[in-house]
A protein has these predicted regions:
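Mobile active-site "lid"/loop adjacent to the S-adenosyl-L-methionine
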Residues: 112-142
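S-adenosyl-L-methionine
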Residues: 75-116
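C-terminal catalytic and target-recognition region of SAM-dependent MTase-like enzymes
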Residues: 152-190
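Helix-to-beta-strand junctions that scaffold the AdoMet/dcAdoMet cofactor pocket
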Residues: 147-149
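Non-catalytic substrate-recognition/targeting regions of SAM-dependent transferases
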Residues: 1-26
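Conserved SAM-binding motif I beta-strand of class I
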Residues: 66-71
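Conserved class I S-adenosyl-L-methionine
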Residues: 42-51
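Conserved SAM-binding loop of SAM-dependent methyltransferases across substrates and taxa
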Residues: 52-65
Length: 190
């Protein structure tokens, strides 16, 4: 229903206020979604762990050539498709897949120019820190291996136990493992 639709920067989103993760929509990512929009023009965009598809919807408005949204939850894929239909009815530039992120990255054949990694928390407490850093390193390495030369990676950590320096080190380690040189364009916050 319309009372479950929220507006952000002129875009509409279905929100599940009762059963959604946290608030049902991550408002702390608003500025980062706008940044994705700015970089998307003419690009093949992959949004991993898409949930509501916020980044995907912004990439579409940013005139991406195509946008693929991936989430392990079929419910999330239904939600991103509903949000696309709300904003870009019938637009064939978007496809969504209910699939494990690592499996999708292994099998993907599309040459992506921009990849967004916004996974759920890998560590909610200090005891899980080592495994979380390993997970972030592995995930980012896989993205670096697959992204086109000159591509842009938006990568996020919402793990409270992982600080900014540890996350940055995981990303740079992933780049080195993949044989890719990287530079930070923006230090994002959420």
């Amino acid at each position: 229903s319309d009372d479950n639709v929220s507006m952000e920067n002129g875009l509409k989103f279905h929100i599940d206020w009762l059963k959604g993760q946290k608030t049902g929509f991550f408002v702390d990512q608003r500025d980062n979604r706008s940044l994705v929009e700015r970089y998307s023009k003419g690009k093949n965009v992959l949004n991993m762990f898409c949930y509501t598809g916020g980044f995907s919807v912004y990439a579409m408005r940013g005139e991406a050539k195509l946008v693929h949204s991936v989430d392990s939850s079929a419910k999330a894929v239904d939600l991103v498709n509903a949000n696309m239909e709300l904003n870009f009815p019938g637009d064939a530039r978007h496809e969504a897949y209910a699939e494990d992120a690592f499996k999708y990255l292994d099998r993907m054949t599309v040459p992506y120019d921009l990849i967004i990694l916004d996974p759920p928390a890998f560590a909610k407490h200090k005891d899980a820190l080592r495994n979380a850093i390993r997970g972030y390193t592995k995930l980012n390495a896989k993205a670096f291996e697959k992204i086109q030369p000159g591509g842009i990676l938006f990568t996020f950590s919402c793990s409270q136990a992982v600080n900014k320096d540890q996350f940055r080190m995981a990303v740079f380690t992933a780049a080195a493992m993949s044989g890719r040189s990287v530079r930070i364009l923006h230090q994002l916050h959420q």
